Amino acid sequence: LCLSCRGGDYDCRVKGTCENGKCVCGS
């Protein structure tokens, strides 16, 4: 979970990961 991820769709926020301080959506 990328706690710093704001906005985007629910799937991105829930399944995404943090890379270099940015939210990367899960596949």
Swiss-Prot record:
Disulfide bridge map: 2-23, 5-18, 12-25
GO CC term, one of those recorded: extracellular region
Location within or outside the cell: Secreted
Keyword entries, A-Z: Disulfide bond, Secreted
Lineage: superkingdom: Eukaryota
The UniProt record lists the keyword Repeat: no
Keyword DNA-binding: no
Tissues/organs with expression: Expressed by the venom gland.
Note: Negative results: does not show any toxicity upon intracerebroventricular injection into mice and abdominal injection into crickets. Has no effect on human voltage-gated sodium (Nav1.5/SCN5A, Nav1.6/SCN8A and Nav1.7/SCN9A) and potassium (Kv1.1/KCNA1 and Kv1.4/KCNA4) currents (in vitro).
Full protein name: Peptide Cn29
Organism whose genome encodes this protein: Centruroides noxius (Mexican scorpion)
